[in-house]
Design a protein with these regions (language model features):
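A helix-centric hydrophobic-segment signal that preferentially recognizes long
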Residues: 2-204
Length: 204
């Protein structure tokens, strides 16, 4: 008799639990809980692409340096500034917390911009060495670096946009309630210089 009673109670208890979960899920959806999760994942995905493209550029620098060093007359100071800038980029510790830490994100961006400046100066100097520009190895690097710079621009733009959407969800009611429940707050972003939507021109 007791077993029969238990069998009757079990389905009722299951239905009660399911109904309770449904009642809990409804207000969570209403306060934008799911939107917070979605925007959070978009930020993480866009940041991963930013990291990937900057790393690709950094990986190309040693090849560029080696090709340029083949020209004995090339300005050493310009070449050394590129090597030093890349070293600083490599010295910046990047982990999952960087997208939530304004200081870390700025350190990362400053190091990358420093390398961008060093590479730009290098390319200006290369204009004085037509023999170097004419080599197959240099032309191959030209194509790779141009492509990477374009992808960096696109990745940065998407990251800035995804952070903007995330911050909107975090700050605007009622989704701000869901953000608070998940312990989420406003995230830092890259500076957006004029012409960010236009890839930098890399001339060789």
């Amino acid at each position: 008799m007791k077993n029969d009673t238990a069998k009757v109670r079990t389905p009722r208890r299951s239905r009660a639990i399911f109904f309770s979960l449904f009642l809990l899920a409804a207000p969570l959806a209403g306060c934008g809980y799911n939107s917070v999760i979605e925007r959070d994942e978009e930020v993480k995905a866009s940041w991963a692409e930013v990291e990937n493209q900057y790393k690709r550029r950094s990986d190309l620098v040693p090849n560029l340096v080696n090709v340029v060093k083949g020209n004995a007359n090339f300005e050493k100071s310009t070449l050394e500034s590129v090597v030093e800038a890349r070293s600083k980029v490599a010295g910046v510790k990047v982990d999952s917390s960087v997208i939530d830490d304004p200081a870390k994100l700025k350190q990362f961006e400053d190091a990358q911009q420093n390398l961008s400046g060093a590479l730009s100066r290098l390319m200006v100097v290369v204009e004085r060495y037509p023999e170097l520009k004419a080599t197959d190895s240099f032309r191959d690097l030209q194509a790779q670096i141009e492509g990477t710079e374009n992808r960096i621009t696109v990745a940065r733009k998407r990251f800035i946009e995804s952070v903007a959407e995330y911050n909107k969800v975090v700050q605007v009611f009622p989704s701000s309630i869901g953000a608070s429940m998940r312990g989420k707050s406003v995230r830092p972003t890259f500076s957006a210089p004029a012409g960010l939507d236009k890839p930098p021109e890399v001339k060789f």
